[in-house]
A protein has these predicted regions:
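Electropositive polyanion-binding surfaces
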Residues: 4, 8-355, 359-365, 374-381
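Short, compositionally biased
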Residues: 383-385
Length: 385
């Protein structure tokens, strides 16, 4: 099973999830199902009033999930737009606990932004499938409950990295390097009447993004996507010593591993194996060469999985629109170059190429387009004016 997990990765498509683990493990024995005891790794840490994370501890434990909650219902409750979820109300003390966690999560988030973390907002519509048919594309908006979990996971990943470092263990870090194409980001800022420093500076970029979100919220998702592409992809890298400067530019952190999803991602499972060895005073179960090879392999596996997921999202959008040839849509130009002009329509949220009527258009222009053609297999959507 170990070799199978190494060559697989969890892949999420509109119609089916392909888990890294066999289904009995992924959805049952390793899943935090309600009212079931599970063996787990617990990461404990203290968060100061200013959102600073103090290094914590790791330990093995038996945990129990007392309520199965959904992001959307918890988000509505936290925002004051919905009643308390029934499962939460029935679990003694849980509502107060989640209120406290929400407050702490916001402090963690604010601290990261002050340190230069990037607050991006890209549009990746999720296909809604009913009876095997794509019936809708839904843009998942920012969700306070989901952000709560993300904030605690980011903090836990940092604590885990520093814990293993203190134990003199090598680690596979999650790295987004300082952008090599920073000059392109400078040019992008100038086109919007802004300035960025000559050298990469995540705090300056974060402040630029905040200003642009406030100035032009409609076009901000497209700006976010352009920034993501220019930042470059994330990768897994073997880190042997604290002196290594590799960090996560987008999160504005230096010490960062993936550790919170060992039943979905192989790098997280490797981190757990390292942590368990450190906890029991054993040597690393991997040599540095093995970890280096695994880091390269896991990066390639992740890239392959993401490529499949992107293609499936494009095909799902093309399939949904395939019955609407000739219909007109309101949209915005997201790309304009000699290679082609691209338009993002608002409803349903989808992007395609403008194959006719491209003259005098520039990025950010509002347009009304007609759907001319779709190719489901290729994931192509063609518009014209």
């Amino acid at each position: 099973m170990g070799s199978e997990m190494c060559i697989r990765d969890s892949v999420y498509t509109p119609t089916r999830v392909f888990p890294m683990l066999p289904e009995r493990l992924s959805t049952n024995l390793t899943s935090l199902n309600p009212e079931q005891d599970r063996i787990a790794m617990v990461i404990s840490y203290t968060v100061g009033p200013d959102g600073t994370v103090e290094d914590g501890t790791m330990r093995r434990a038996r945990v129990r999930n007392y309520a199965k909650l959904a992001y959307n219902s918890v988000d509505a409750w936290l925002e004051g737009n919905g009643s308390i979820p029934q499962a939460m109300a029935e679990a003694e003390g849980m509502a107060d606990q989640i209120r406290t966690q929400d407050e702490v999560a916001q402090r963690l988030r604010q601290r990261r932004f002050e340190d230069g973390a990037l607050d991006l907002e890209t549009i990746e519509p999720r296909a809604i499938v009913e009876d095997g048919r794509v019936v809708q594309l839904r843009h998942e908006k920012k969700n306070r409950a989901r952000a709560l979990i993300e904030d605690f996971m980011i903090a836990a990943n940092g604590v885990t990295a520093r814990y293993l470092e203190a134990k003199k263990f090598p680690t596979i870090r999650r790295v987004v390097r300082s952008p090599e194409r920073w000059d392109r980001l400078e040019t992008l800022a100038k086109q919007l009447g802004e300035r960025l420093p000559i050298e990469p500076d995540s705090k300056a970029l974060s402040e630029f993004l905040l200003r642009r979100r406030q100035a032009d919220p409609l076009r901000f998702p497209d700006l976010s996507l352009a920034v993501v592409k220019l930042l470059g992809r994330g990768e897994y890298v073997l880190i042997r010593t604290h002196d290594d400067e590799a960090g996560h530019f987008g999160l504005a952190v230096k010490d960062y591993v993936h550790s919170t999803a060992p039943n979905r991602r192989y790098p997280d499972l490797i981190t757990h194996r390292l942590a368990k060895a450190a906890l029991t005073g054993r040597q690393s179960p991997y040599s540095n060469k093995e970890l280096e090879d695994l880091a390269t392999h896991c990066t390639a596996q992740e890239d392959a999985a993401e490529k499949v997921e992107r293609q499936m999202r494009k095909s799902a959008a093309a399939l949904l629109l395939s019955t609407r040839i000739g219909d007109h849509f309101e949209g915005i130009v997201t790309g304009a170059s000699p290679k082609g002009t691209w338009v993002r329509i608002f409803d349903p949220p989808a992007e395609g190429r403008l194959v006719r009527g491209t003259s005098d258009l520039d990025v950010g222009d509002r347009v009304r387009v007609r759907l001319a053609h779709t190719d489901v297999e290729q994931g192509f959507i063609d518009f014209e004016r």
